[in-house]
Amino acid sequence: MADVEASSSASKTPKKKFEVKRWNAVALWIWDIVVDNCAICRNHIMDLCIECQANQASNTSEECTVAWGICNHAFHFHCISRWLKSRQVCPLDNRDWEFQKYGR
C-alpha cells in the first residue's frame, strides 16, 4: 500500500513547461544630464575633480561626488562649492543656484 501512495504522489508532480538553459542579461544605462564634463574643472563628471586628484597622493580626500542643480547642470561637488563662495548662480546658465541632488 505504501508503494501505491508513493507512485501516485510522484505522478501528481506537475511537469515543467520550459527550462531556462542560458540567461544573457542586458542592462541599459543613460545619463539624465546634457554635459558629462564638469564645466569648472573640465574633468569627466565621474572622474575625480582637480582638488581630489591633487589630494589623492595624501589619500585624505573625501569621496568626490557630483552635484546637480535644479537647472539639471552637473558639477563636482568640490568645484561648485568653490564657485558658490563667490557667486550664487549656475556657471553655465547664470540662474540662481539651488541643489537638486548630489551623490554618485
From Swiss-Prot:
CDD domains membership: mRING-H2-C3H2C2D_RBX1
Sequence positions that bind Zn(2+) 3: 71, 73, 90, 93
Pathway participation: Protein modification; protein ubiquitination
Segment forming the signal sequence: none
Localization, UniProt: Cytoplasm; Nucleus
Zn finger (RING-type) location: 49-94
Principal cellular location given in the protein's record: cytoplasm
GO cellular component term of the entry, any: cytoplasm
Residues the record lists as binding Zn(2+) 1: 38, 41, 76
Record's comment describing the protein's domains: The RING-type zinc finger domain is essential for ubiquitin ligase activity. It coordinates an additional third zinc ion.
Protein name (database record): RING-box protein 1
Organism: Dictyostelium discoideum
Lineage: Eukaryota, Amoebozoa, Evosea, Eumycetozoa, Dictyostelia
Gene behind the chain: rbx1
